[in-house]
Design a protein with these regions (language model features):
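Flexible, glycine/charge-rich interdomain/linker segments that couple
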Residues: 141-143, 147-154, 170
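Alpha-helical scaffold within the catalytic cores of cyclic-nucleotide enzymes
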Residues: 123-139, 165
Length: 170
């Protein structure tokens, strides 16, 4: 009986540990996904690592082509609510055009656009302009965007990212 009791206790402890690890993993998943996207645009992953991480982290990047947009709030605003509001305005405008993944990188917000066709960029630019006008009018906060080139493969994202970051500096 003691042996069975120990085995049951061990089994219960293992199950509780698995549940605890699963809970920790789920809580840290958004951060892990963000780190993956940063590595992706910076070019620090092999194609095999890209595939494995997409699967492991449940990040869908299905698209015919991609483009990176970098955004920085130009006002020296410590008002977190205003910054959040600006980001939400941009998100809402972009959602009307195409799917995307947004993540923070240093003091910028990076948008990885998942495009069905390069022609969507015209609508993207219009959406960003409209979000800029809304932000200035309602939030009194301006932002700047840099847009990288369109690429067809995930491996080409670092070039688009570099261009978007450089464009933001002008």
């Amino acid at each position: 009986l003691k042996k069975i009791h120990r085995e049951l206790e061990t089994e219960l402890e293992q199950r509780q540990n698995q549940e605890r690890f699963a809970e920790i993993y789920q809580k840290s998943l958004p951060l892990l996904q963000e780190q993956f996207l940063i590595q992706l645009v910076r070019g620090s992953l092999t194609p095999e690592q890209m595939q494995r991480q997409q699967k492991n982290l449940s990040v869908s990047l299905d698209a015919n082509c991609f483009c990176v947009v970098s955004m920085k709030i130009t006002e020296e605003s410590d008002d977190y609510l205003s910054q959040f509001s600006v980001a939400e305005s941009v998100n809402e405008m972009l959602q009307q055009v195409c799917p995307f993944r947004a993540f923070r990188y240093l003091d910028k917000i990076i948008y990885l656009l998942l495009l069905s066709a390069p022609s969507e960029m015209i609508r993207i630019q219009k959406a960003l302009n409209e979000a800029s006008h809304i932000s200035k009018h309602y939030n009194q906060v301006a932002f700047s965007c840099g847009i990288g080139s369109i690429c067809e493969k995930l491996e080409e994202l670092p070039a688009s990212f570099s261009q978007a970051m450089e464009a933001l500096e002008y």
